[in-house]
Amino acid sequence: MMNISVIGCSFVGLLNRLRLLKLHPGVRFFIDASAGSGNRAIAAAVLHHLAQVKPDAIVVLWSGINRIDVPMPADWHNAYGAEVSFRKIQDQYWYHSGGFSCGGFYPPTPKILIDYFKSQHLGGTPEYFTDVSMLDIIGTLAILKTQNIPYYSNFIYDVHADYSEYADILFDKPLEHTLGKISPKSHYCSLFPWDQLDTQNTPFEWAKNQNLLDTDQFHPTSDAMHAWFEQFVIPKLDIQPPSNV
């Protein structure tokens, strides 16, 4: 049985494990999705899977450049935490500033975290957010490259595009905290391994061009996400047919 870990934000949550199993007998998919997750928490989840799950292949979909994650210990979470906008990894609770729904900026997220997220976004620059995301992504991709296992890596959207006007049309408010654009002024741009990402085939742009976005006009439909996954991800994973076929 081949084990494949699929890690990311709410886009990954659109994939159904049983549906994938029917299409790919002999493959066990571990779907690790956390709505609103930023790239720091996604990086932590990838390392957790490498160390604990030990998959035969990994799929990682990076999320918004401008999203912020902060880890909190279990005792703090049990005393003050909320059952929203976080990803649990071992004894760490990674709280997210939020994605499409901006969950981390409002109750029941604890006020101390709301204030922290707001201070980050009020004071942050495009270079700051790019640096923070790139640090985690560069390090994680470097580790993946050394593991000698197949992997697929991409962003959920085109990080070189400016979606501020698109967000204004949908919600009459900017979504820069949700998405964000890579700043070419980042200290780490020259180190970023673009050749390790399939950035020409991001799921948001693919679904948008195919007119397969869900009613929120941000997420692909579940069927669209599965179609994108089969077309662009599966061929990169060197999946072997079951031994009894």
For the regions a language model picked out, list residue spans one by one:
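Serine-esterase "nucleophile elbow" of acetyl-processing enzymes
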Residues: 1-52, 221-227
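Alpha-helical cap/lid subdomain in secreted, periplasmic
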Residues: 47-245
